[in-house]
């Protein structure tokens, strides 16, 4: 669940998916974040995360073609906007996870 805290911090509160993937460069962490989203019942958010990841990976971030840059930024902004639909449920799940009962559900000792 710690990867979801990082995902929330970068995507929700800082710079969106583009910012997240640029700062968290480990594909294993991306896979864990997507898996954890599914684990907490946010399968649609996990799919959206996958679309954003694929867009990030398939884009030449060093291109000088303005049309490519504009299309990428437009598509990423749309995905960031759609992400907002899942933020309340994500925050609820993260709050539960931080609670004593939530920690115990994950096999960790409560506060």
Model feature map: region roles:
Residues 1-111:
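Extended, alpha-helix-rich binding/interface surfaces that flank or overlap catalytic cores
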């Amino acid at each position: 669940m710690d990867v979801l805290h990082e995902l929330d911090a970068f995507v929700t509160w800082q710079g969106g998916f583009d910012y997240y993937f640029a700062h968290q460069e480990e594909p294993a962490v991306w896979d864990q974040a997507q898996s954890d989203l599914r684990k907490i019942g946010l399968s649609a958010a996990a799919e959206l995360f996958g679309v954003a990841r694929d867009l990030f990976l398939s884009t030449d971030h060093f291109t000088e073609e303005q049309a490519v840059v504009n299309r990428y930024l437009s598509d990423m902004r749309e995905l960031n906007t759609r992400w907002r639909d899942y933020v309340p449920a994500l925050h609820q799940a993260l709050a539960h996870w931080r609670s004593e009962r939530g920690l115990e559900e994950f096999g960790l000792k409560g506060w």
